[in-house]
Amino acid sequence: KISDGEFVLFCGRSGCGKTTITRLVNGLIPQFYQGELHGRVLVDGQEISNIPMYQIAAKVGSVFQNPRTQFFNVDTDSEIAFGIENEARPPEKLAERVEQTTEDLHIQKLRNRNIFELSGGEKQKIAFASVYAMNPQIYLLDEPSSNLDMTSIQELREHLRLIKKQGKTV
């Protein structure tokens, strides 16, 4: 059992199941990936297989190992706003949330850029920002420091402290 506000790190060799665990918690297994599940996965007291994906997405934010696999837009601002756009927020609230997110994460220099022109580390930052903008209770980060240089890893550490301070589960 992982409690609210807890910070958990899964370590292990390649292929041991770390990504599989994240896919179970964010509902991709069994809804998108086939597999045989023995046991139950509960999020917020509910069995994950019984929760619609849109409800899971409101509670669980995922940053994938390869950030390109989660992008839906070409420019960074649209990508950061994408998840909250699906919540039908008014345009001015979207703009405010994108601004607040980029300020909180100190990534203003990445605003209004073409995603395909970003470095791997910058793409990782935008992927994290798109999840942060949605303000989920649970963050699932699959190899979040991949593609990051040492300075960016330090920045990620500060971002994780920020969400931990907000009482989020990581």
Language-model-detected regions and their locations in the chain:
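Conserved ABC ATPase "signature" region
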Residues: 92-110
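Hydrophobic anchor residue at the start of the ABC signature
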Residues: 128-129
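Conserved catalytic motifs of ABC-family nucleotide-binding domains
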Residues: 135
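Catalytic Walker B motif of ABC-type/P-loop ATPase nucleotide-binding domains
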Residues: 139-142
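Helix N-cap at the start of a conserved alpha-helix in ABC-type nucleotide-binding domains
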Residues: 150-152
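Conserved ABC ATPase signature
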Residues: 114-118, 122
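Conserved ABC transporter NBD signature motif
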Residues: 34-46
